[in-house]
Amino acid sequence: MSIDLEWCKLDSSLATYLVEVLNRQLGNAERPSFIGPVEVTSLDFGSASPDVELVDLRDIYRDFLEDDEEGSDRGPVKVTEGAEDEEGFEWVGEYDRGASIPATNVTSSLDTRSDQPDDQKAPLLPPPPAENPHPNLQLHLHVNWHSNLRITLTTSLLINYPSPMFMSLPIKLSVTGLIFIGELAVAYEGERRRVHLCILDDLDPYGPAGDRQRLLPSIYIESEIGQADKHVLKNVTRVERFIQDVIRKTVEEELVFPNFHTIVMADS
């Protein structure tokens, strides 16, 4: 079943948050000696929305619920990495959120006189639990996105001879589009009003890291080295390849299961 998205409603606040996530990842990424610090300066989602198809509807993965209980004091948006302890891990969770009510033994007396002491009266049955108006559910979506988004980055090309950082040339990079093909899990936890997001990969999530390039088979980048009012060198392959690797690594470390994002929704 296809799903239509109102892509135009993606606002600047989400773009600002994603810029912060990318800059955090870029700050921790190991850079080649010839590239200076990299910073994302702007992000535009573009006009091309992804093709989304609903492929499955199921119970929420147990990993989402357990992490939510352990990290209930965290901020409204968090990034969660899979725990190192893999004991009891269940890839396709079949977790029953319905809390069982313990059986209550009720002893009734044949003598129903009104003068029976209060402490000898039969205990009252507990009231039935209130039905949750927001049930838990998890959607699996197949996403095919030929994007025309635009991400602008700045960095510098370092010349380390005859001494370190002997010369620095400014670089402007623009990601002008990408292709994403994969499966996205969106889990809605109604009781706590939280949404968990992650990308599902065919590889074993706890196995050795594989080639995730198939999730982002194409990333289009334009590069300029030098100042705009002087000589400019365009489309430098080595710099563009480094940025492509960083983007793919960011997607893997931030969103590929068992890593996921949790968004805490405001109470209505």
Swiss-Prot record:
> To which species is this protein native?
Laccaria bicolor (strain S238N-H82 / ATCC MYA-4686)
Q: Which gene encodes it?
A: MDM12
- Provide the protein name: Mitochondrial distribution and morphology protein 12
> Could you say which protein family the record assigns here?
Belongs to the MDM12 family.
InterPro entries from the UniProt entry: Mdm12 (IPR027532), MMM1_dom (IPR019411), SMP_LBD (IPR031468)
UniProt KW keywords: Endoplasmic reticulum, Lipid transport, Lipid-binding, Membrane, Mitochondrion, Mitochondrion outer membrane, Transport
Chief localization class?
mitochondrion
Domain note for this entry? The SMP-LTD domain is a barrel-like domain that can bind various types of glycerophospholipids in its interior and mediate their transfer between two adjacent bilayers.
Positions of the region Disordered?
66-136
| Known function | Component of the ERMES/MDM complex, which serves as a molecular tether to connect the endoplasmic reticulum (ER) and mitochondria. Components of this complex are involved in the control of mitochondrial shape and protein biogenesis, and function in nonvesicular lipid trafficking between the ER and mitochondria. MDM12 is required for the interaction of the ER-resident membrane protein MMM1 and the outer mitochondrial membrane-resident beta-barrel protein MDM10.
Show the PANTHER family listed in the entry.
Answer: MITOCHONDRIAL DISTRIBUTION AND MORPHOLOGY PROTEIN 12
